[in-house]
């Protein structure tokens, strides 16, 4: 392991304790700095979705592009927004509304047959934000996909050697936050041959609090 759990627990406890108390529940975040890896090569970049074992203390917001029965099932499954093919056209004509939607939703899923249209009409808005929908088979029940993404985070380095990810909320059990962090670090371990040579440093912090170095 890049970091042992006990060290993570102590660092998270310190970050929560050091941060000034706010009027809202703050998110606990992790920053991972990499080295000895050429991010100009696409194969070295990280771009993946990680399902956290304990969630973030609050569910992620999910948008679904669908029609007919799948759209109805998505609404029943509690999707935060369901976008029909007609609404794709409306959003394409109203970039401001499209950007607002893209910024307010954490993950999108879409029936596979709708993907080409979404890419053509909304790709310029969704792509740069890392919000291109995950395709699901036509007529598939969207509920399992929605439920999984509720507790997931997206990790994306692009061409940078640093990535940030939320790992929980300050009111969660610290052990659970640490286990979430370890799940994200597993991505780095599985991605690179010598992860200990690739990880330069790891920090944890509350949204508005000071960072605490883990390694």
From Swiss-Prot:
The keyword Amino-acid biosynthesis does not apply. The keyword Methyltransferase does not apply. Keywords: Repressor, Ribonucleoprotein, Ribosomal protein, RNA-binding, rRNA-binding, Translation regulation, tRNA-binding. One of its GO terms (molecular function) is structural constituent of ribosome. One of its GO terms (cellular component) is large ribosomal subunit. Signal peptide: none annotated. It comes from the Archaea. SUPFAM superfamilies: Ribosomal protein L1 (SSF56808). GO terms for biological process: regulation of translation; translation. InterPro entries: Ribosomal_uL1, Ribosomal_uL1-like, Ribosomal_uL1/biogenesis, Ribosomal_uL1_3-a/b-sand, Ribosomal_uL1_arc, Ribosomal_uL1_CS. Belongs to the universal ribosomal protein uL1 family. Binds directly to 23S rRNA. Probably involved in E site tRNA release. Part of the 50S ribosomal subunit. PANTHER family: 54S RIBOSOMAL PROTEIN L1, MITOCHONDRIAL (PTHR36427), LARGE RIBOSOMAL SUBUNIT PROTEIN UL1M (PTHR36427:SF3). This is Large ribosomal subunit protein uL1.
């Amino acid at each position: 392991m890049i970091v042992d759990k006990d060290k993570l627990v102590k660092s998270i406890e310190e970050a929560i304790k050091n941060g000034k108390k706010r009027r809202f529940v703050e998110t606990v975040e992790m920053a991972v700095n990499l080295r000895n890896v050429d991010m100009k090569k696409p194969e070295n970049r990280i771009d993946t979705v990680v399902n956290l074992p304990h969630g973030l203390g609050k569910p992620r917001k999910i948008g679904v592009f669908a029609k007919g029965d799948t759209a109805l099932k998505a609404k029943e499954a509690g999707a935060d927004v369901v976008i029909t093919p007609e609404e794709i056209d409306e959003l394409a004509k109203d970039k401001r509304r499209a950007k607002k939607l893209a910024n307010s939703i954490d993950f999108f899923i879409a029936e596979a047959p709708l993907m080409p249209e979404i890419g053509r009409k909304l790709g310029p808005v969704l792509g740069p934000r890392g919000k291109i929908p995950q395709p699901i088979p036509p007529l598939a029940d969207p509920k399992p996909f929605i439920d999984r993404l509720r507790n997931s985070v997206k990790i994306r380095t692009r061409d940078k050697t640093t990535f940030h990810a939320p790992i929980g909320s300050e009111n969660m059990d610290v052990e659970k936050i640490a286990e979430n962090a370890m799940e994200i670090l597993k991505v780095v371990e599985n991605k690179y041959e010598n992860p200990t040579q690739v990880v330069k440093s790891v920090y944890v912090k509350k949204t508005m609090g000071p960072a605490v170095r883990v390694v």
